[in-house]
Amino acid sequence: MVKRHLPSGSGALLVLVVLIGINLRPFLTAIGPLAGQIDAQLGLGMDRLAWVTLLPLLLIGVGVLLTPALLDKAGPRPLLGAALLLLMLGSALRLDLYSGTLLIASAALCGLGSALVQGTLPGLIKGAFAGKVPLVMGIFSACMMGGGALGAVLTPRVALHLDWSRALALWSLPVLLALLWLGWRVRLPAAAPHSAPSGEPRLIALPRAWLLIACFGIINSGYGIVVAWLAPAYLALGWSPQQGGELVAWLALAQTASGLGLPLLAACKLDRRPWMGLAIVMQVAGFGGLWLAPEAAPILWCLLCGAGLGGSFSLIMVIALDHLPDPRRAGSLSALMQGFGFILAATGPWVAARLHHLSGDFASAWQWQLGGLMLMSLLVLRLNPRHYARVMGARVMGARAMGQPAPLAQRAQTVQSDTPA
């Protein structure tokens, strides 16, 4: 049997998952509520301001694609350390911003740091918490979204007493706490070169990988659009920066609850499609409300969007890991999905900015995301776990020969289904 090297001290690793998750979104969510002040001082305009969200998402995508190769060379510990240093440096650069270029550069550094984290942690979670992947991925997603809520609600309030750039820079401090915990308490495996087992197909060549990429991209395009433009949309309606920040916070809090709750509800069965369907319905209702009646029930629309986005993000991360039994291969699939998915998602804020430029309002941005959700609702129907082994080209006997139990998805193939793969 192949000995599986797992991180020792799963409790310490879980604390690290929480600390890192909290730090992955404030650098994005803090910008929207301050958009008016930033534009007034730096003169960015809507199109350039979109790059503060667009560029990090793009770099997260590129960085996550490179992470599996970096893991083979360096291992998870140096990569997570480098990720936290990049996040801390990116936030610290905002201490005394004097140009839009520097603001965009700081966002780029934070995006690269987030990329290394999101390409590394899913595989570690799959290996260290094999029986509790939905729970731990839910915790990770919830912390990420909870951190986003804190960024949106606290930053504009701190900016009342400090310069807005200094308020943004304060988010370097909680990153330092995560870095200290990583160095003090967490033990992780060393690098171990890895290649696909003989006969296993390259993940990038599989249609299923691209289906997951499309779903992930649509989900995170919606997140990018609301993070970038929800607060500015309500600022344009006469709301204050603090009120706009509260809306983003409501959205992020709903993301947090749903990001943890839906994976737990879905954990009883390997077929996560009913719960993903619920998440899509909530998003359709929320984005539809923002489009048709933005001032009728803004908090409700934000709660629906947040719950749908948070639940679908956590579920698609779990679904990707469900497809393969081996933690490293599952982590590579997750990295591939996130990499190309974030590149796709990066177009969302830019398209929304262009549509706003052409139409003069934000309704077209919400319509754009609704179109993506219609497409995603069709793609999700194909995520039948009974077909995971077949669509991934896995061989049950090959997995058993390596000392790995056949995954539930493979065992389930004894019962055939008429649902398309």
Residue ranges and their predicted role:
Residues 31-32, 207-249, 253-259:
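Extracytoplasmic gate region of multi-pass secondary transporters
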Residues 43, 75, 96-101, 130, ...:
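Helix-breaking motifs and short loop linkers at transmembrane-helix boundaries and internal kinks
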Residues 62-100:
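Conserved MFS/SLC helix-loop-helix module at the cytosolic interface between two early adjacent transmembrane helices
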Residues 63-75, 258-271:
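Helix-to-loop junctions at the C-terminal end of transmembrane segments
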Residues 106-142:
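Cytoplasmic helix-loop-helix junction between adjacent transmembrane helices
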Residues 116-129, 311-325:
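Intracellular juxtamembrane helix-capping segments at the cytosolic ends
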Residues 131-132, 138-187:
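Helix-loop-helix hairpin linking two adjacent transmembrane segments in secondary transporters
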Residues 327-362, 369:
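A late C-terminal transmembrane helix in Major Facilitator Superfamily
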